Amino acid sequence: VIGMFCGMFNGLGITILRMPHPFIMTLGTLYIFRGTGNLISGGVPISGFTEEVRLLGNGRIDLTWLGLKESQYLPVSVVLIAVVFFLMWAFLNHTRTGKWIYAIGGNPNAARAAGINVNKILVIVYSLCGLLAGFGALILAGRADSGYPNAGLNAELDAIAACIIGGASVFGGRGTVLGVFAGVMIMGILRNGLNLN
């Protein structure tokens, strides 16, 4: 929920201040939110999460019911991420708001002329992005069994790279959830492959 409010803050700032490019606002608030997190935590990891939070990051689903000879597991986090990707695909491709998001990304002035409430949709988009970022942070904290103030440092660069590799435009109006999924997979393969000795 905190992530959603951080995203809403960005969306309101961009729409009210009429920022020429959203990167100005989002990069500025990135440092504000990161500094606030360090201030609240005192710069040290926070531990003592509930079993439910640990389950998000470290939980496993036993797949022996599929008739496999060996005990195989599927991480809960993989299932959660797959569900999020499916829901976002359905939202962007099968709802009116999803179509409006593409229209606003392509040409906000034309979308406004077509009767779309651009500011409202932008606030919704930034709120949703903040909610999903918070959800991802919760999974990461569950995986590490503690919240590190510097966890996810420079993850924004990986996210931007994955989106661009997946065919999304930094200027808006282009991109698909499946393309972003492919970009995430490519980035994961490259990152893991480069870490091998």
Language-model regions, residue ranges each:
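Alpha-helical transmembrane segments within multi-pass membrane transporters and channels
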Residues: 1-29, 182, 186
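Alpha-helical transmembrane segments of multipass membrane proteins
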Residues: 8-13, 35, 85-87, 134, ...
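Helix-loop interface residues and adjacent transmembrane-helix termini in multi-pass membrane transporters
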Residues: 16-20, 94, 171-174, 196
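Transmembrane helix-bundle core of multi-pass membrane transporters
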Residues: 22-100, 121-124, 143-152
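Hydrophobic/aromatic residues within transmembrane alpha-helices
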Residues: 32, 110-111, 164, 186
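Start (N-cap) of specific transmembrane helices in multi-pass transporter permeases
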Residues: 118-130
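Transmembrane alpha-helical segments in multi-pass inner-membrane proteins
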Residues: 126-127, 133, 143-197
